[in-house]
């Protein structure tokens, strides 16, 4: 049941993100931070939802008429310098194959961060993105808090499997 509900919601929002790329960026943030598909048990568990929304958002940017903030390199310079430095350090890593694998994963996320930064055209959108991040991470804080209280702190609280917040740190 969770699979069907999540698939209907995410599949229904995909065309919306083609018309309004900022919605796609918000859904990408939810998928990246909350990993809702990892709370399912069936076919939706391993679907590449983040990839679908990244592609839909990028396609939406190509065809949108809304204002995209790309006028000044100063806005993106810190992120671009950081990405360049990550590339340099990855090239000289001791365990190069492992470092390249991780770099390929992380560069995709940072690409979407740049895309989201381009779509933050006003203060309202910044607030929306902050609330999406707060609610996505706060969900697991609330869920973990309730679990800890009901079990008396006997077990560890883990995040969703194969996610950035999987471990206990």
Feature map (PLM): residue ranges:
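Non-cytosolic membrane-interface motifs at loop->transmembrane helix junctions
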Residues: 98-105, 159-163
């Amino acid at each position: 049941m969770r699979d069907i509900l999540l698939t209907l919601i995410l599949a229904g929002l995909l065309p919306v993100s083609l018309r309004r790329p900022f919605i796609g960026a918000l859904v990408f943030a939810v998928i990246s931070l909350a990993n809702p598909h990892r709370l399912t048990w069936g076919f939706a568990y391993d679907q590449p939802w983040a990839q679908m929304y990244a592609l839909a958002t990028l396609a939406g940017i190509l065809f949108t008429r809304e204002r995209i903030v790309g006028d000044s390199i100063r806005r993106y310079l810190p992120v671009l310098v950081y990405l360049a430095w990550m590339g340099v350090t990855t090239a000289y890593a001791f365990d190069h194959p492992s470092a390249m694998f991780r770099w390929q994963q992380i560069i995709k996320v940072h690409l979407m961060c740049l895309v989201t930064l381009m779509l933050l055209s006003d203060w309202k959108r910044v607030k929306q993105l902050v609330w999406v991040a707060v609610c996505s991470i706060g969900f697991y804080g609330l869920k973990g808090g309730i679990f800890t209280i009901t079990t008396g702190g006997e077990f560890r609280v883990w995040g969703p499997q194969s996610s950035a917040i999987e471990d206990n740190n």
